[in-house]
Amino acid sequence: MPTIAQLIRNKRAPKVKKTKSPALLFTYNSLHKKTTKNPSPLKSGVCTRVGTMTPKKPNSALRKYAKVRLSNGFEVLAYIPGEGHNLQEHSVVVIRGGRVKDLPGVRYHIVRGAGDASGVEKRRQQRSLYGAKRPKKEASK
């Protein structure tokens, strides 16, 4: 426990919280070639690679991911949620924060239904997460 004199001499330093999605914190000014801190919830980017990855130890699957070059110059790995996708190299996508626990290095999710990423077909529940439109009502008899 510090004494009062020690606290006067040297104040308590606030704890610095480290962000879990650092690529969303910055924007790039191409006119001045400078990166500035300007956090945003979403960022757009272009897919440079689309592929599958196997998850960590207890799980087994082929998870779809894309390597995305963001508008601020960062290059990140983003998970493609839902069943089936239409993404390929040079597709324009929007990413949000949110890691995938069993994929190392994947800290972002691609937003379905935004940019070139289409919504999930035949999705009935939790549609907003997957960019699926509301199904048309069938004619009642």
Swiss-Prot record:
The modification 3-methylthioaspartic acid is found at residue 102. It holds the Pfam family Ribosom_S12_S23. Residues 115-141 are annotated as: Disordered. Keywords: Methylation, Ribonucleoprotein, Ribosomal protein, RNA-binding, rRNA-binding, tRNA-binding. Belongs to the universal ribosomal protein uS12 family. Part of the 30S ribosomal subunit. Contacts proteins S8 and S17. May interact with IF1 in the 30S initiation complex. This is Small ribosomal subunit protein uS12.
